């Protein structure tokens, strides 16, 4: 019997690596399915989910209302929490009021990071930067936060 291949799309970030570890290392096996992994940044995954491109994909909470007609939320797999994320980084300590009007690096407009920041402090200038380059953007001054 031929195995049906399912593409598992997720980011290369450590939280997604942890969530998909069992499938990626074939520690979770199926006699019916073969899982192939596609690694992309979260904003790209959000956009591709809007087109229903993958059978199984990681997305942002913010993106889900836009793809709810194509995907179900699984009972496990989340990367939001106190002291974990989303979080802001800056060269020096800042208050919420200090964020007003600042250029803030975000990993995309459909991300949970952008949504929660917009609720916390709606008056900022979003600077879209791939997730893995946010620290560099703050360090080199492309973004204030």
Predicted features and spans:
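N-terminal hydrophobic or amphipathic helices and topogenic motifs
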Residues: 1-79
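Bilobed "Venus flytrap"/periplasmic-binding protein-like clamshell domains
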Residues: 3-25, 86-145
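Short, flexible loop segments at the rims of nucleotide/cofactor-binding pockets, characterized by
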Residues: 33-36, 83, 122-125
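Portal/gating segments that form or line small-molecule/metal binding sites
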Residues: 75-90
């Amino acid at each position: 019997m031929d195995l049906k291949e399912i593409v598992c799309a997720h980011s290369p970030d450590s939280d997604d690596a942890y969530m998909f570890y069992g499938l990626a290392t074939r520690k979770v096996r199926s006699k019916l399915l073969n899982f192939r992994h596609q690694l992309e940044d979260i904003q790209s995954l959000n956009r591709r989910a809007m087109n229903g491109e993958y059978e199984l994909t990681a997305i942002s909470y913010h993106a889900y209302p836009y793809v709810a007609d194509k995907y179900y939320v699984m009972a496990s797999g989340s990367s939001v929490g106190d002291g974990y994320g989303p979080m802001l980084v800056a060269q020096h300590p800042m208050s919420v009021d200090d964020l007003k009007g600042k250029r803030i690096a975000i990993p995309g407009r459909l991300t949970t990071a952008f949504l929660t920041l917009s609720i916390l402090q709606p008056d900022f200038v979003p600077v879209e930067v791939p997730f893995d380059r946010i620290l560099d953007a703050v360090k080199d001054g492309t973004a204030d936060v």
